[in-house]
Amino acid sequence: MLIKQLSSSYNEYNNNYAASFLIGPLPEGIAQSLGFNIRSVLLKEFPYFAVKNIRFNPENNNYKTHIGTKESIETIINTILGIDFNYSFDFYKAMGLYKSKPKALFQENLSKAKFLCSAKQVGEGILYAKDLMLPVGIKCTTPYKIIAHVTKQNFLGFTFELGFLFGLNNNIKFENKLYSIKTYPIQNINIEIINSKKSFNLNSESIILSFTTKSSLQPIDVIKILSYLLLNKHLILIKAFQQFLD
């Protein structure tokens, strides 16, 4: 990966640095997936980063971005260099999205999901991490059983926090009380867990959670909940609508 600094400036009035960068070229098949990663890593490391205009150029698989912060230009560069692109590559490849057309694949899944929802079938609503674009108009009245794959490092204290994007109330605890999920209503929708179990995969050093929600949710609400975790690297989904659609 190459980083080319296109411009930089310093504003004495507000003590703010700004720089624009060209990031790439990136590996084929994952370049379009990394805009969220770039933004989320920068904002996680430095919440006061102003990350603007992340634009992808499909002709040469690179990104152009403009960043403003009170941190030095060197800090910005080091932060961008610290983004784990290999992690993203392995993740999407493992999900079968490498060198595929994920948007078209996702739209195909939506058609199947819409049919199953209309048939009121209960299945496992397992979502693609990178395609957080489900139209609001597609509704589902079936309970969701969501299977999540969580790394040990990001599963601190057996607690998820779906944070500030959605408000601050309504703690949810699993029945076995070994761990809890803190989540918050979205558009006045509460999630109530009625079944749960936990297992540990020694090979991947990962914890597998499964739980069933009692509330009727729209797919867009589930995606909003999970996308916050995904973009903050608290949660990695290992399947995508697979059993829900089969």
Swiss-Prot record:
It catalyses: RNA(n) + a ribonucleoside 5'-triphosphate = RNA(n+1) + diphosphate. It is found in: Plastid. Keywords: DNA-directed RNA polymerase, Nucleotidyltransferase, Plastid, Transcription, Transferase. It is an enzyme of class 2 (transferase). It comes from the Eukaryota. Its main location: plastid. Its EC number is 2.7.7.6. One of its GO terms (molecular function) is protein dimerization activity. GO terms for cellular component: DNA-directed RNA polymerase complex; mitochondrion; plastid. InterPro entries: RBP11-like (IPR036603), RNApol_insert_sf (IPR036643). GO terms for biological process: DNA-templated transcription. The keyword Plastid applies. The keyword Coiled coil does not apply. DNA-dependent RNA polymerase catalyzes the transcription of DNA into RNA using the four ribonucleoside triphosphates as substrates. Belongs to the RNA polymerase alpha chain family. In plastids the minimal PEP RNA polymerase catalytic core is composed of four subunits: alpha, beta, beta', and beta''. When a (nuclear-encoded) sigma factor is associated with the core the holoenzyme is formed, which can initiate transcription (Potential). This is DNA-directed RNA polymerase subunit alpha. It comes from Helicosporidium sp. subsp. Simulium jonesii (Green alga). The gene is rpoA.
